[in-house]
């Protein structure tokens, strides 16, 4: 019953009837699944606490205390609200770890495939939502409220499918074609959303995966020099390709056909024509430089209006490069957590991530590294799938250890 409630929640996660940040229908089903999982575990007297998640519990205590202190000082309700977000994430992590099994993962992968096909049907039916730029450009966002939100959902679904694919002991032609077909579908949908953050994630994923394959083949080949020459040629061709897409000094994205490539060129142009303050300002991260003391002990998560840049800050910016004013959270999961809670809680959370990832299948690390690389561009760590991918890495690592132990004993 709990597994089915979980699957329904995953399917409903793509439907946003209320503004982002509100409680959605999927959250209600996730909560119901969590309650049913807890009841089932308590009734069967199975494990209710996992030692692997002790660092998470420590981080949660820090987060509750820090947000509590700032709530007492400011009476701003955003602080307890963000604490509840973290408690919710902990509950979902516990539930996912408890439900994790071969049958559960098979069902989850099927729901992920259904989600991707559904968004494709929404695209071709013409009923999807679009984000309209001020000058007329459009980005597809399916049934979501934001194109980056849509792209992140598709991206994490792709990673879940990859993690499930790598759990298989035997790879048939049907399995390979089925998986990579869905992966290409996901890449196509991300292209429609024109998300540069997800592009970075996919780029890291393929670079790590290709690097692993190249290293393995090179080490076991009798023609190592040939492999090294081939690798060098590939890097040169890649560099030439990057050089060819570099935008000119007068680049204007509004004068292009507005594709993912033109958005990448736009980002490159901004980096080339701006400075460090421009880059930070675009991510709402100027506070990292203006008030670095919070990196030590934390600013709490909420009441972001406190960090409106001081008068005269605009003089540090390059005119005409960035024109968006932010007063919200930092657009980077890692730096937002670090700034909000300080160096010790952030280090504890990083330790938990490393523990879950370090012993998993090498290829699966490509998926986790891609997720972490993408998380530096957007604040996505409140999304359930962000943590599910990391927990999957940890659970597959445990399975690997068990298999190795059984092999040795056998």
Which residue ranges define each predicted feature?
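Loop-to-helix entry and N-terminal half of a specific, functionally important transmembrane alpha helix
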Residues: 7-8, 181-182, 328, 350-351, ...
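Transmembrane alpha-helices of multi-pass inner-membrane enzymes
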Residues: 34, 157, 206-209, 367-376, ...
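Alpha-helical transmembrane segments of multi-pass inner-membrane proteins
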Residues: 105-131, 145-215
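Helix-loop-helix junctions and helix-breaking kinks within/between transmembrane helices
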Residues: 16-29, 76-78, 145-148, 178-216, ...
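Aromatic-anchored transmembrane helix interface
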Residues: 52-65, 74-99
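Long extracytoplasmic/lumenal interhelical loops at the membrane interface
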Residues: 271-341
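N-terminal signal-anchor transmembrane segment
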Residues: 1-43, 62-71, 122, 127
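Hydrophobic transmembrane alpha-helices and their immediate junctions
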Residues: 44, 54, 165-175, 215-217, ...
